[in-house]
């Protein structure tokens, strides 16, 4: 090989390496952009810290046929001469089945079911007033219902701020609660429709004196149905002994947490169309990164596998916890300790029970 040909070969080799590096760099940049959120979750233990643990994690005592007097005493509280009035307040979207289960479970203990809905989603998409249009389904609770409508705002040019709209609706709920007649000393339950307190928890807080003025209610987390239970628990719902400063909020408000107080059944819908609606409607709708995320066949497969609808990694703060929760949720064959109304109407709510993962399109 002549010197000139060797020089040409070296130049070609350098050019090839440069081109290869350029291609690899471009692919890497595209991959980072496409998977930025997933990468962020993967390295969360490096840049984020977990919220402070609750300082007061209250044991929760309950068994059938134990008197409320004994239960109050076990918690260090005393029995009231009469129960508190209870106001159950939710901002409603489209979870009609879970609303029915919630109200049937809590009906004996609740004075007023306070429900606020809007004609747009948090993301500014027009939506029906699902509760108003299906109110005849809830005639069993008609005398206890206080219903309000929030005039939503349509999104324009992608500038909508879903968390700001959500905060506005929570402020509107404060006004609706006062219209519903809530008074100082009443018990206020704050939570989303799918965060359902157990009836005995509400009864306990209704009948006992000495309870904390504000406490969070720990709830077991379920995904798609009661067949898939997640390891971690939900602490967002709260119970308040109402006073003039009480605000309807879904954020952390106290360091007191009552153990094992209910069920959080996330994306527990009957129809695939309801999954599609919520994926586009709720505050984290930016997680729908591709159109194929909304394909019915994909959603159905994910429901039956116990996978994540948004192809997200778990939100964890240590690599140990992150790797522990990778993969599909384990399937459970147990339908013990689920809402009684679901078991009493098992044919109607088969989709929430083990073996019922198949959904209709809707």
What kind of region is each of these model predictions?
Residues 67-86, 119-190, 198-203, 324, ...:
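Active-site-proximal specificity loops/subdomain of glycosyltransferases
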Residues 93, 120-121, 152-154, 194-195, ...:
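Conserved beta-strand elements of beta-rich interaction domains across eukaryotes
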Residues 195-311:
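Conserved catalytic core of nucleotide-sugar-dependent glycosyltransferases
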Residues 88-94, 116-117, 190-193, 217-220:
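Short His-Asn-centered micro-motif
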Residues 106-109, 208-210:
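Short, conserved loop/helix-junction motifs that constitute active-site signature segments
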Residues 1-89, 94-95, 311, 315-362:
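Juxtamembrane luminal stem/stalk of type II transmembrane Golgi/ER carbohydrate-processing enzymes
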Residues 83, 87-108, 118-120:
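Active-site beta-to-alpha loop of glycosyltransferases that engages the nucleotide-sugar donor
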